[in-house]
Each structure stands twice: as structure tokens, then as C-alpha cells.
């Protein structure tokens, strides 16, 4: 009967590698926990956003009437931002690390080299963290960026004036709305009156891509993925928010393909506080404008 001799130095080296792997995973956990501290602490109150959809309207009113989107979301805006257990990204990441550890042990039992196994696992962990946990630039920029301050909307006094004064005020209204919109956005398309067929077309295109994830710029230099399911809204409410984006009704009435990423970004920016915390508003404004220009040109 043959005997298999194991070199004690090889066992010590393997144990040292395992300890190094455990320390690396613990370091990643602590880093992510520190970076997510601003999501677990005091709730963030967003008083006013320059990207609010009320400011993206086009002054195409003949009677200077304010848009209907300017009413009634104070109750939902005042809700405190607390992450539930299902929304906490740290919990699925912990499960992911546990699964990676199990895979490491199984591969090592088959006789594969630890360095090769760990290099592959490290690449997977780094890619997972880069996608799901974009790092903030620093604490100061994070604190300043989470509290966005927008210019207050000027009240439209022309709605209470006679019709004779409504025509001269249209040019000033256009300038005020252009100044209050997001950086780099110049809305050139207006929404026409819609009907049931338009709503059906918008709902159909959104439903087809309801679970598709789109890339959005984060407050750090990275990106994050978002889809319509994460809005946790009814399809009718999403369609209502999409109709407030200039040009969407016109494209739907003509049967053209809709800029779904632009629609998702606009609706999420208004209704999702978590999206507001993660997204880079300036870059999002440029992306939404580029998508609108691209789809309107077709």
C-alpha cells in the first residue's frame, strides 16, 4: 500500500494563503460598509432639485396655465429615506461573498492552484463592487452632493392677468424656464394633446423593456444600472410621468420608438429618492438631451 507524503511547508503556505484571502474579504466588507454609511445614517431630505420635471416643461401654453405636474407630491417627498432590508445592497453582497468562498474551497479540493483560483475570484469581486457600489469622491463632496439646492421656481403671475398681457409674457417665461432647467438641456420638442392610443403605445414600449437595465452616471466616476421594476410604481403612473417629458407624446402618436432610458431617468429622478442619491444630475441631463435629440431626429 502506497503512502502519500504531504510537505508541511506546503500546508503552511496554503493556510497562509487562506488567511490572506479572509483578510482581503474582511477588508472589502469594511470598505463597502464605510462607503454605504451615508445610506444607513440620518435620512436625506431633498428639498428642491434643479432636475425636477416641473422645470423641464416647454412654455407652449397660450393662456399661461401652469402644468399639472406641479401639484401634489409633497406628501411623498416628505417621506424619510430609510433603506429596507430588501433594498440594502450590502445583504446580497454578503451572500455573494459567501458563495465565492464556497466556490474557492471546492476548487481547492480539486487540486487547482490557489493563486489562479483567487485571481479569478478577485476579478469577479472587483467587477461586482464596481457595478453595485460606486465609490464617492470624498466625504465632503458626498455630503454636499446629497443636499442639492435648486433655484426656486418663479410664480407665473401671467395666469391671473388679462389676455392682452399674456402675449408679451411668453418670451420671459421661456427664458425663465430655460434658466431653471438642468445643465446642458434645451428642450426643443413640445408635447401635443394625447389620447388613449398614445398612452397605450407608451405603456406597450415600456412594458416590453420593463426589466431591462440601463446605464446611468453615478455621483462617482462610475456607473450604475437601473430599470423600471426598481421604481416600484404602477405602469399607469410611469406612463403619466413619461408624458411630462417633452416630445414623448409626439413620438408615441407617430408610432416611433421612444427614448426609454430618457423616460426612465426622468421618472426616477422625480419619484425615486434612492435614484436621486446615486445619480449624477449634470451628466444625466446631458444624456437625456442626447437621447431626445437622437430619437426626435429619426
From Swiss-Prot:
Keywords: Chaperone, Host cytoplasm, Host nucleus, Host-virus interaction, Inhibition of host innate immune response by virus, Inhibition of host interferon signaling pathway by virus, Inhibition of host STAT1 by virus, Inhibition of host STAT2 by virus, Interferon antiviral system evasion, Phosphoprotein, Viral immunoevasion, Viral RNA replication, Virion. The modification Phosphoserine is found at residues 211, 272. GO terms for cellular component: host cell cytoplasm; host cell nucleus; virion component. Residues 144-174 have a biased composition (Polar residues). The lineage of its organism: Viruses, Riboviria, Orthornavirae, Negarnaviricota, Haploviricotina. A motif (Nuclear localization signal) lies at residues 212-215. Belongs to the lyssavirus protein P family. Phosphorylated by host PKC and by an unknown kinase. Residues 57-79, 141-190 are annotated as: Disordered. Non catalytic polymerase cofactor and regulatory protein that plays a role in viral transcription and replication. Stabilizes the RNA polymerase L to the N-RNA template and binds the soluble protein N, preventing it from encapsidating non-genomic RNA. Also inhibits host IFN-alpha and IFN-beta signaling by binding and retaining phosphorylated STAT1 in the cytoplasm or by inhibiting the DNA binding of STAT1 in the nucleus. It comes from Irkut virus (IRKV). A motif (Nuclear export signal) lies at residues 49-58. One of its GO terms (molecular function) is RNA-directed RNA polymerase activity. The gene is P. SUPFAM superfamilies: Phosphoprotein M1, C-terminal domain. One of its GO terms (biological process) is symbiont-mediated suppression of host JAK-STAT cascade via inhibition of STAT1 activity. CDD domains: RABV_P-protein-C_like. This is Phosphoprotein. Homotrimer when phosphorylated. This trimer is stabilized by binding to the L protein. Binds soluble protein N, and ribonucleocapsid. Interacts with host STAT1, STAT2 and PML. InterPro entries: PP_M1-like (IPR004259), PP_M1_C (IPR037199), RABV_P-like_C (IPR049506).
